[in-house]
Amino acid sequence: MNEGNRQKAMNLIGLAMRAGKLITGEELTIADIRNEKAKIVFVANDASENTKKKVKDKSSYYEVPCFELFSEAEITQMIGKPRKVFGIVDNGFAKKTKELIEG
């Protein structure tokens, strides 16, 4: 992913947070993956291996795209809360974010 698209994705995620279309935190995100509400999931690239494995396994099982693109500091900056895991629950935001990530 190029730097321009990375910044656009970060801005879009911040907008989704302000629009109330994000679920944050490991347990809530995993619950939304299970309930098939989460459309795309992000886990901090500096999260613990256990956290990464748990989120990725759940995402894989329920066929929810999961990305490890941002650090915890970047996630905190984007959403305004110190979190390592979050998911987008809106189809529109999820689709556009995935397009930006995949170039």
From Swiss-Prot:
The keyword Metal-binding does not apply. Keywords: RNA-binding. It comes from the Bacteria. GO terms for molecular function: RNA binding. RNA-binding protein that recognizes the K-turn motif present in ribosomal RNA, but also in box C/D and box C'/D' sRNAs. Belongs to the eukaryotic ribosomal protein eL8 family. NCBIfam families: PRK07283.1. This is RNA-binding protein YlxQ.
